[in-house]
From Swiss-Prot:
This is Transcriptional repressor NrdR. Keywords: ATP-binding, DNA-binding, Metal-binding, Nucleotide-binding, Repressor, Transcription, Transcription regulation, Zinc, Zinc-finger. It comes from the Bacteria. InterPro entries: ATP-cone_dom, NrdR-like_N, RNR_NrdR-like. Negatively regulates transcription of bacterial ribonucleotide reductase nrd genes and operons by binding to NrdR-boxes. GO terms for biological process: negative regulation of DNA-templated transcription. The keyword Lipid metabolism does not apply. The keyword Transcription applies. PANTHER family: TRANSCRIPTIONAL REPRESSOR NRDR.
């Protein structure tokens, strides 16, 4: 594997271990030329369905896009990176289990919203506001009211 720092193609694996979610192997590598260390992840490559966009065009499923959009929604929220990876893995599993060769972008967005709903309600509202193209405050209020109806009553916060 090439070193990302000096582009030399001779690197050694210093340490290998299974990631916390068990879906990847984490490897620490050292470049023999510049002696810098870096981390790589090895995952099984699966045949995920193509994504059909709203305009009808098709594109490959890109895990990085899902992770990036979830991280944006979760920005400055107390959610660990491992939890995001696990959520994306669940989305991928659902897509694989469906057996479909294509998935509409709307369906993919709904899967992301379902995962965000479980991770962090603020992130869910952020993502939903962009994904569903909220146009006024009442749409935010409707989503928040959904949560109030679904969530059990919490005792008042002590200050």
């Amino acid at each position: 594997m090439r070193c990302p720092f000096c582009r030399h193609d001779d690197t050694q694996v210093v340490d290998s271990r299974v990631s916390e979610d068990g879906a990847a192997i984490r490897r620490r590598r050292r470049c023999s030329a510049c002696d810098k260390r870096f981390t790589t992840y090895e995952r099984v490559e699966l045949a995920l369905p193509a994504v059909v966009k709203k305009d009808g065009s098709r594109t490959e499923f890109d895990r990085r896009k899902i992770v990036a959009s979830m991280k944006l929604a979760l920005r400055k929220r107390p959610v660990a990176a491992d939890a995001i990876d696990a959520a994306v893995a669940r989305i991928e599993y659902q897509l694989l289990a469906s057996g479909e060769r294509e998935v509409r972008s709307e369906k993919l967005g709904e899967l992301v919203m379902n995962e965000l709903r479980q991770l962090d309600t603020i992130a869910y509202v952020r993502f939903a506001s962009v994904y569903r193209r909220f146009e006024d405050v009442s749409e935010f209020a409707d989503v928040i009211e959904e949560f109030r109806r679904a969530a059990p009553a919490k005792p008042p916060r002590k200050r």
